Structure formats: structure tokens, C-alpha cells
Amino acid sequence: MTMPHRYMFLAVFTLLALTSVASGATEACLPAGQRKSGMNINFYQYSLKDSSTYSNAAYMAYGYASKTKLGSVGGQTDISIDYNIPCVSSSGTFPCPQEDSYGNWGCKGMGACSNSQGIAYWSTDLFGFYTTPTNVTLEMTGYFLPPQTGSYTFKFATVDDSAILSVGGATAFNCCAQQQPPITSTNFTIDGIKPWGGSLPPNIEGTVYMYAGYYYPMKVVYSNAVSWGTLPISVTLPDGTTVSDDFEGYVYSFDDDLSQSNCTVPDPSNYAVSTTTTTTEPWTGTFTSTSTEMTTVTGTNGVPTDETVIVIRTPTTASTIITTTEPWNSTFTSTSTELTTVTGTNGVRTDETIIVIRTPTTATTAITTTEPWNSTFTSTSTELTTVTGTNGLPTDETIIVIRTPTTATTAMTTTQPWNDTFTSTSTELTTVTGTNGLPTDETIIVIRTPTTATTAMTTTQPWNDTFTSTSTELTTVTGTNGLPTDETIIVIRTPTTATTAMTTTQPWNDTFTSTSTEITTVTGTNGLPTDETIIVIRTPTTATTAMTTPQPWNDTFTSTSTEMTTVTGTNGLPTDETIIVIRTPTTATTAITTTEPWNSTFTSTSTEMTTVTGTNGLPTDETIIVIRTPTTATTAITTTQPWNDTFTSTSTEMTTVTGTNGLPTDETIIVIRTPTTATTAMTTTQPWNDTFTSTSTEITTVTGTTGLPTDETIIVIRTPTTATTAMTTTQPWNDTFTSTSTEMTTVTGTNGVPTDETVIVIRTPTSEGLISTTTEPWTGTFTSTSTEMTTVTGTNGQPTDETVIVIRTPTSEGLVTTTTEPWTGTFTSTSTEMTTITGTNGVPTDETVIVIRTPTSEGLISTTTEPWTGTFTSTSTEMTTITGTNGQPTDETVIVIRTPTSEGLISTTTEPWTGTFTSTSTEMTHVTGTNGVPTDETVIVIRTPTSEGLISTTTEPWTGTFTSTSTEVTTITGTNGQPTDETVIVIRTPTSEGLISTTTEPWTGTFTSTSTEMTTVTGTNGQPTDETVIVIRTPTSEGLVTTTTEPWTGTFTSTSTEMSTVTGTNGLPTDETVIVVKTPTTAISSSLSSSSSGQITSSITSSRPIITPFYPSNGTSVISSSVISSSVTSSLFTSSPVISSSVISSSTTTSTSIFSESSKSSVIPTSSSTSGSSESETSSAGSVSSSSFISSESSKSPTYSSSSLPLVTSATTSQETASSLPPATTTKTSEQTTLVTVTSCESHVCTESISPAIVSTATVTVSGVTTEYTTWCPISTTETTKQTKGTTEQTTETTKQTTVVTISSCESDVCSKTASPAIVSTSTATINGVTTEYTTWCPISTTESRQQTTLVTVTSCESGVCSETASPAIVSTATATVNDVVTVYPTWRPQTANEESVSSKMNSATGETTTNTLAAETTTNTVAAETITNTGAAETKTVVTSSLSRSNHAETQTASATDVIGHSSSVVSVSETGNTKSLTSSGLSTMSQQPRSTPASSMVGYSTASLEISTYAGSANSLLAGSGLSVFIASLLLAII
């Protein structure tokens, strides 16, 4: 991973971590100064139409303050922005809302507007401040005062152009420092920054948890660049109230006071105080009503207090209320009520209500004041003061002010313990206001239970009456621990209305359980309002654990009972457990359990009713059980177990586990017991914006891969979108069901950044077979994971039960890559990470990395890629046993990757890395194949460890319809005798898809990449064949690339790569990459043919050797001596009737192209041009036959080949070559004579002789790289041979013999054949035991084409001195038609006294020689030579062409080549290469020009390489008259120039 990616991940992680901290404990303030209503607003300069500055987060956070400050206003409570630019119309000037604008600047109701939208307008529309609302940045600061404790959601409905909102100290601004310069925090609560013309962020909102009574710093920064400006701001309070635009009563300002030390409150939750107050009120009812409310008030000391207000309303009737106050040692006031009947002194019986108030024995006095108000809820506040009583003593007095609203009945049950032996129940009636603001008649049922060991069970039943009835029964039940328990059954009969019962459990410090009931209205997930009965159960804060078990039954209502038992957790510790059994009707509803964190110390459970539509399209009534758990350090683990009952049971246990990071964690285990029916449990993970994990369950019916319908239970786990990563680990175990648990740990990813990771451990039964993971894309915004069961048949023919884990990933999150890692565990673990990578096309892509950790004890891991008709990539795993190439059986884990056949080709790239395992990932790119058609390509990148030795790729055919890639490890002994661990990548390709060709290309990467492309070629039989091209890209920095071909008995071609170090003739060691191609010993032959119709010959003969340079189509020379000396057959360049064939003495024959992407190149015409009025550019490209010459050079230098002649060529390079095509080439030639030893062989008898030879040296400079070439050419015509001192190469040549050949001559499209004697020259080359024989037929006399003569000016240069002479010359012309493009090739050859012989001394081209041509007309002569030669096992048909043209124009500079090399990625046209001069020796001038009338669309694809050709033209001039072999060399020369 690149460093920018590391920094990007670190920034994202830090931002998310800060967001998480902020959401958990937002810093608040308690400024002591004078409070002022509203916010302060500062205005700053912003440039009109600046479309980039406001897109910078740093500018929006603090950078704006560096601009010019225009002014400020204060006391603003209406803080939303809605600015409309003016429309100047015929009827006047009016503001035009943006939604009313139309067309080319018109406004509804006003008509066309004559003014411009893109200029600055001045007005006071922004908070009364005169500025340019069209282009301005403003900052709003103030303190937000929350009236309630809970989550506040701030929202921007839209943004035009850019805005942010921050809440909290050290985020918006520091406490008591509102007017200070802005701080640099970019931890925005709302990030509404959007680029110019871009779309808005998806959810322009943010949530902050705040505590009532504290002041929270709040800052809004807004920028507008041009025209309209819009920023609507709203906030939703914890009770659901939404405040929009006008924030009066919520936002305030304070003057700065940097000296106030207690201004900052880092975590307000640590400062909250809880008190309980009791208020007694008279009323006109006939009974006493008691209600309880929770509120938070801020006292005169500025400290907020959580307050429980118990309101007791007593009747003012003839009954008597007696209040008894008793002191006690507790710290709160307790109030209880009793009912009795007394007989007064008048003998009349009176019902008497005794209110016993127990007050703390402190000196404080509690005064309660009740006031009415117009709100919909009851407000309670507490103040502390000191009063002086009538006895003159001061007393601390607590004044409780209760404000009640001036406004259906609810049954509230209060349970109290007492010392009697029976249960007493009384009922009272009152009216309370619920959380929805509606008044409710409330029936208070006071249940006094004995303080014995009995358990109170509450059962709720519906009935047809309009009130709630409560009765009590006593029974004895046996719990799950086998112990009998006295149980008090409280039967509550409630009216059969459409209400929903929600149970909330709260802890308290008493020794009994209290149950109360309230009525409210909630809106479910289906948007429908539901009346909800809230049953509040207060349980003692003992060490017991509350377990809720839902059970179905046949009644029409929900019953709740409680049992006591003792269970032993997974940590072996016994736990007292309270089992709350909820019996629900057996209707079609589905129970969903949602777990939410909250700041309390107990677990609360509530229930809601809603209707959802499952994945099968059917609506389902759903009961949502909301479990609120304390936000402590414990982790909630959900375990699913089957059982034999007919309902789902949920229980909770506490245990302590040690995570993978070695830290102990308190863990809450939620055990969900599901019926052992035919349903399947599927777990789906969804992200959401909350801070806790929610789990719900749905029922649906799916059709598995077996075609059978299955009832499926979908468990939806919603996880917070924090910086943590959800990792799913699958483990086998010996149980019969699947268990899912969650752990928290911290891991360090491949980018070096630590990440909090949620590990979801899925334990599956080991009897259910293998586990396969399938990844599917979908349109959702989160990753969903489900599980299916199926039966598959492995490669060994055995059926296997397979658990398919289907991971659905969002298609908007980028690519999905699968990485396989070994580990020491005994099971396969799958986790998911998010990263951003840059593909080969330079485009960054969000990538989901699926890391599959497989056990290292299960053998090797092979990856098989299969196409299928699906639209996503599926990954599954199978187990099999294979026998490797060393004969040893190996357990193999086969990872089958099924890719969609509509996504294009699949290529496999192997990269080394420093890891200890093999990683496989997938990327998407666009490539252009050899047929010129762009194809979407899926690149499978296999990263293998560099410590495991070499990586070889073996290609095997098979009968499958897809390409399979697997990996084996073996140990081989290289050519240097050293054993090497080799990773063999076996690629099995289908035999029905045609031929398989391997192309080797150099590149700048540091590893070898292997990819596969599909193309269609037409063979010599005229039949099209589908061809699979395996492109192997090898690094150019690793030294030379050598290809060695070996026969073997296999039925396919295997390609492997070895590394070796060789010492060249220059004494320098060179790293060499040896590509070993093993070909089957069957009769595989390759025939080459020309790719166009042009057949061109020339009547010039020569006998001098020529050096032929080679460049691949991408401009980098990569052919080493080993490559050139391999058994390779390709076509020759010639312009004379020369027949050349190669026969390999063994049964192995193969065809290899030296070009990067063309494995079938056989004819490559070249062209060069020169002009009479200006210097011209010259390009050449070609492919020649392999030959038996010796070439050595230093590492990374260009490599050249010569013709098949007895010569020795050496090359040295002064520096490393560049990787691109050389823009210019300079050639220098010098000569000297020396004596050489020539070895001649005939009939396997060899002799040596001494012969004088011309030593010719030439240098070529390509992009600053200079290479020197030395050639020894024997002067005499006596045939000699030389045996080289090499370990792998040996060159011999036999004496010549003569024969008669048939020559085809063509002129004006009319061809004739003539018989001519020819010299037969044969030579053999033995390379690594493979012998190749080369035979050349050179006609002794040739039929020359019709010639015309003209005068040419020949410039001769020697030793830097040039002279010009006029000489008659023979004009020889030829035409070639390639893809309907006709090219005329003229040659001017100056006449000499002896046409058949020229001086044996080569011209020295130490300077630049320019040849000016004066001829104005061209005639066309065409001579064709076609020879078919049968040589034993191999048949080669060679048709050779060369191209030369002339013209007296200088504007056009064109080089053409056949389209077989037109797909190079580094093609450079002549018109782009600069001024490369065409240099020739005296005696030969060539010129080429494409006809000016030729359309550009008809041009043939070409590849060019700039090289000055003066040496080669001069050499050809020196070889015009000679023996047979010289024809071959001269022909090559003319083809090049």
C-alpha cells in the first residue's frame, strides 16, 4: 500500500475516532457571566465565483478568519439563511426565489430578467448586515442550551453553496471563549461541504448527546460564491420535537471570561445528581392518586439534578387524610399510603387515608410549590435557600417548584413490601400527561406484598371492559433449577384496545420489584401510530441477571411472568437469574430483538408492533423487542441455539472472555434459542448512524441452490458506522446448530493503522460439511451476510454438504478483493476491510478486502476461476487431495472464484511481496486485445511471498469451459546446480477455446505479471482459430530475459521462470531471468505467412554480413543472446530471391515472436524516406529469423541480431537503456583488417584456416545510451566457420553446393517463373542439445527488372571530409499493396565499372551524410520470389517483402508496418519522433513517401524505431557483387532501410 493511502486511512481513522469520542462525551460549559439571547455572527470577505476555496475543510473550520472581516451582528435567534437574488424586469425589481427561476433567466410572475445572475449584489438580507450575500462567508457562534437529556439531531435540509456545523467544547470553540479566533478542529457535527457543481452529501445531519442544563458551544460557518444562498437549519429534540429556523430559547451568548477555571465540563454525565421529591396535592376525587415523573433541573448552584417527582393527589371529600411524618436515617424522602376506617367521637365511621412520610433526619426542610402552566408536561425544579423561622433559627430550605399542565385511563401498578403475610391491593384514579403530551386517566394499583422469599409474577390479560382490573393469586411453582418457589400471581386485565404492551426494566435500591404502567403513542417503522402501554418494572439492584424468554401461546394477549433460577455461565461462575417469561399470541407476527445502549446502569426491554415486508414480498406483523443495555465496557454476544420448543427464547448471561488482543472483556451473552424446525438462520449486517448494535429478526421463504423452498429466519444486525471493522470468523464445533457471537479487538491492517475490530464468530456444526463464501454486489449501502445450505460434488466426485455464506456488498463501495492468508487456527476465518487503491488505469477505487484465513495444517491453497452467468463474483472453498509433480499427495484447499462471463476477460497477475502467505485480490481494468477491441478485464492479483523461492507458471489444457489457476510448491535444481523452492502456478485452460500462445513483454514493474487475452487468428489453412494469448510481463530491472524451449512428454505447453546469474564477454555478471517453455513432443507445427498481398523482390546480390538491429513494439530491447539462439522460426526480410528455411533436428518445433503482443508476425515491411529539399525522418521495425551468432552485452542494453553467417558480433553499452522508444539514433563506422580463424565443416568433418578479415565497428546512440558493434568479415570467399567458446551455443557451417531453383518474377501484376542455378549453403546451430539446420538457396544469376538511368549527386565522406560527384544511376522500382495501400519503392544505384564487384572496404561514416535526390519520375517494376520448401517434419512457407518509395516532396514523413505489430503500447509515429536524419553511404540512396492522397483511415497500424541507416546502406553497396550468401545479407539490408 502506498504512503498516500496510509495517510488517508490514518486521517479517516482519526476523524472517526474523534467522532466516536465526541458522540460519547461531548464537552459542555457552565459560563458564569451574563447570559444574552441569540448568536453572534461575523462576516468575512469571499471572492465572487470562487469555486474551490469553500470546498476546503480547513478553510471552513478556521481559514475563513484570515480573510478580511467585514463586520458582525449579535442577538440572532433566527439563524437559517434564504437569500434570493433580485430580478430586474419590466414590472420592477423583486427578489426571485431559485425555485421560481426558469429558462435563460426568467422568474415566474415577473417575466424575463434583464440583470445578470453572476454578479455581486449588495443588500441587508443577511441578518440586517449590509454586505454582498452573493459572495460572503459568515460565522455564527453561540451556546446551545438543551432542555432535555438525550440525543439531539441537527440537520441542514439543503446547502448552497457550502456549510458546516460543530457542537461541543474544543470542537466549535473553547468554553468561555466565544469571541476568540476559531480553533482548528475539523471534527464537524455536520459536514455540508460540497464541490462546485457537485451533489450534496447523502445525510446532511449529525447527532449529539447532551445533558439538560449545560451550555454547549455551537458554531455554523457558511459560504456562498455566487447568486442564491440557502441554508435551512433545524434540530430534533429527544422527545421528537423539531425546532426549525428560529432557535429562540435554545441559543445564547456569553462574554468571554478566560479566567473562569470551572467553565469547562468535560463529561457532564459525571456531574449529574439524582434526587427523589414527593409532592402532595388536594383534589376533588374520592381517592388518593400517586404518579411518578422523571426530569432534570438546574439548581441555583448551577448543577443539574436528575429528579424523580412523586405526586400524591388526595381527595378533599369527607374522608380524612392523615399525614404522618417520620424521621429516618436515609438520604431521601419516602412516602407511602394506607387506607383504614376509623370511628370518630361522633360515632360515625370515616374512611381514612394515612400518608406516611419518612424524611431524612437532616436539618433541611422541603417545601413543595405547585404552579399551573400551558405546556404539555410537568416540570419540576429545585432551589436551595435559608430562611429564619419563628424561633429565630436559620433553616436550610429546599423549595420544589412543580409546574403541571392545565389539561383514556392508564393503569399503574406500584408494588410495596410490608411485614404482613398476605398481599394487599388497592386502586386509585388520577390523570397524568404521557410522553406524547396527551392527558391520560390513570388507575394506580397499590400492591403490598409480604417481604418473604416469594416471587411476584405479573400476568396481563385483555378483556372487553374499559378499565384495568388487577387481582392477586398465590401458588407454588418449580423453577428450572428444580427448586419450589412461592409465587404471587398478579393478574392484570386490560381493555382489548389496539394498544401495544412495552415492558421497561429499571433497577433500584429496594428489595422488591415494582411495576407501573403508562400509555403513550409511538410511530412504528411502517409509519403508523400505535397506542403503547409502557409497563415499567423496577427490579432490585442485586447480582441477579434478568433473562427475558418469549413463548407463544394460544391466547390473544401477551402474558409476562417472572421466575428465579441459578445458572452457570461460560466462565463457570453461578449467577442468580430472574427469568421474565413473556407469552405472546401464536399469530403470524415475528419477534425482532433490537439492542440499544444507553447511559443507565440496567437493561430495559420494551416492545413495539409494526408491519414489514419481507424479502418474499409478503407483509408480516412484527413485534419489536427493544433491549436497552448499559453503555459499559461489556460486549454483547448473540448466540443462537436450537431447541425442541415451538417458540424463540432469548436469555442473557454474563461472562469474561479474553480477546485476540489479550485483554479481558466483560461479555453479555444473549442466548437465542430457536425451534429446531426446517428454517434457516441468516445473519445480515447493516451499518447505521447510531452508537450501538441492533439485532432484529424477520421470517421469509427462499429457494436454495437445490431448488427447494426453505423458511428462513433473517437476523438483521445493525452496527454503528464508526471506525471499527466487522470481521466474520467461521469456526467449526461439535454442536448441532450455528452459534454467532461478537468480540472486540484491535488489529493493525496492511496499511499499518490500528483498527478497532468487531469479530463476529460464527460457529457452525462440523457435521454439516464445508463452508463456502460467496460475494454478491447489490444496491444497498451496507454489507449483508447470509447463510444457506446446499450439497455440492467436489472435484473428487464425492458429494459434500456445504454451508454457503453469501456476502452482499454494495456496488457503490468499489471492488471486492479476496485475500487468502494462512494461520495456525483449525478453521477458515473470513473478515472484511475497507481500503482505497489505484488500479492500473490510474483511477482510485474503494476496495472491500475480504481476508480469508485458512489453517496452515490443511495443505496447499489453490485458486480456481470459473465463469458463470451471474452478475457478481462468487468465492467458495472445497477440499481435495492431489498428487504434485514430485509424486507426493497433498491436501489442497480449492478456492473456486466464479466470475460473471459478461465482465470480460480474466487475467492473473503474480506479484512478490514480503508476506509469508499468498494473497489473491481482484481489480477491474480496460484493455485492448490484439484484435483491437477493448475488453473489460478482471485482473486477479496473486501476491506470493518472496521467501518461498521462484514462481513458475504452467499452462495445462483441460476439458473444462473456464480457466483454472492453482498453486503448488516443489523444489527444483536450476541450471546453476542450486536447489530452489518453486511455487508452481498451474493454469488450466479449456481445450475447446483454441490455441494457447505465450508472449513475453518487459515492463518497469519489479515482478512477473501473467495475464490472459482472447483473440481470433486466421491460420495458413484460411480457418479462423480462437487463440488464448498468455502475456507474461517481466521486469526490465531484473536483468536479461532468456527463453529456453525444452521438449517433454506432457500434452500441453508449460512456462516457468528461473533466476540465474551469468557472466558476459565483458566480464560483468548479469542477473538473467530464464523462461523455460516446455512443449509437448507431439507433432505441433507452426506455419508463417504474409499478412498482405505485396510480393516484392530486387535484383541486387551481395556477400557481405550485416548487423540487423531489433526493437520490440514497445520500444525496449529485451532479446538476449539466449533468446536469439533458441529454436525459433520466423520470417526473413529480403529484397532478392533468397529462400531460407530452418529445420530443427528434434521433434520439437515452435514459433515465438520477439514482439510484445504479436505471436504470429511473419512479414514486416519497413519504410524510410528522404527528400531533395529537407532532411527526413527514418524509422525501421522488423522481425528476423534466429541465427547462430554470438552476442554478449552488459545488463539492460539493447540487443541486436545478425543474419545466418559465420561472423562474430559483440556489443557493449555505456549506460542503462531507457524504457521508451529512442527518439534518435547516431551510427559511426570504422574499419580495420585482421586475421581470423575460420572453421569449415562438410559431411561432419571440420577444418580450420587463417583468413584476412575486415573489422568493422559501429556505434548506436539511443536516448543517450551508446552501444558499440564489432563485425569481422572474411575478405576471401573461401567458406570458413568458427566454433565459439560457449557452454550452450555452437555454430558450424558446411561447404556450399549448387542446385537449380525456380524463381518467380512479377512485373505489372504479371508473373513468370524461370529456372536458375543457385548455391546451396547449409549451417547448423546446437543450443542445449537442440540442433537447428539453416539452408539458403542463392541464385548464381538473376533476372533483373527493367531499369532506367538518371544522374544523381553522391556525397561521399571520409575522415570528416565530404565531396560531391555526379554519377549515372540505375533506377529500380517496386510496388507493394498492404491493406489496399499502394507503396512505390525506388532505388538509385550508381553504376560502376564492374557491376558485379565493388570494393571490399567498407565506407567509414564518421560524419553525417545527406543524399539529395533529384529524380522526378518513378516507374514500377515488381519481382516476386516465392519458394515452398519441405524439410522433414516441419514445413515452412516464407513470403518476404520490403518497401521503399520515393518522391520529390518533403512535407510527408511516413513509416508503415503490417498490423501484426500495431498493438504496442509504445508506438511512436515518424511525425512525432523529431528530426532524425536519413544517412547513407556513397553509392546507394533510398527514399520512401506515403502518397499524399492516401486517407488517414486507410493507414496500416505501425510501430517504429528510429535508427540511422548509413552504415547498413553503405554495407549493402559494398556487397552488391558477391557469392550466394551475400544475396541473403543484402536482402536483409534493403528490408531494413
UniProtKB/Swiss-Prot annotation:
Its main location: membrane. Residues 1226-1392 are annotated as: 3 X 51 AA approximate repeats, Ser/Thr-rich. It is a lipid-anchor; GPI-anchor. It is found in: Cell membrane; Secreted, Cell wall. Gene3D superfamilies: 2.60.120.1560, 6.20.60.20. SMART domains: PA14 (SM00758). GO terms for cellular component: cell periphery; extracellular region; fungal-type cell wall; plasma membrane; side of membrane. For many industrial applications in which the yeast S.cerevisiae is used, e.g. beer, wine and alcohol production, appropriate flocculation behavior is one of the most important characteristics of a good production strain. The ability of yeast cells to flocculate is of considerable importance, as it provides an effective, environment-friendly, simple and cost-free way to separate yeast cells from the fermentation product at the end of fermentation. Residues 1-24 form the signal peptide. Residues 773-795, 863-885, 998-1020, 1161-1220, 1405-1414 have a biased composition (Low complexity). It holds the Pfam family PA14. Residues 74-249 form the PA14 domain. Glycans are attached at N135, N187, N262, N329, N374, N419, N464, N509, N554, N599, N644, N689, N734, N1114. The number of the intragenic tandem repeats varies between different S.cerevisiae strains. There is a linear correlation between protein size and the extend of adhesion: the more repeats, the stronger the adhesion properties and the greater the fraction of flocculating cells. The Ser/Thr-rich repeats are also important for proper cell wall targeting of the protein. Cell wall protein that participates directly in adhesive cell-cell interactions during yeast flocculation, a reversible, asexual and Ca(2+)-dependent process in which cells adhere to form aggregates (flocs) consisting of thousands of cells. The lectin-like protein sticks out of the cell wall of flocculent cells and selectively binds mannose residues in the cell walls of adjacent cells. Activity is inhibited by mannose, but not by glucose, maltose, sucrose or galactose. Also involved in cell-substrate adhesion. This is Flocculation protein FLO1. The lineage of its organism: Eukaryota, Fungi, Dikarya, Ascomycota, Saccharomycotina.
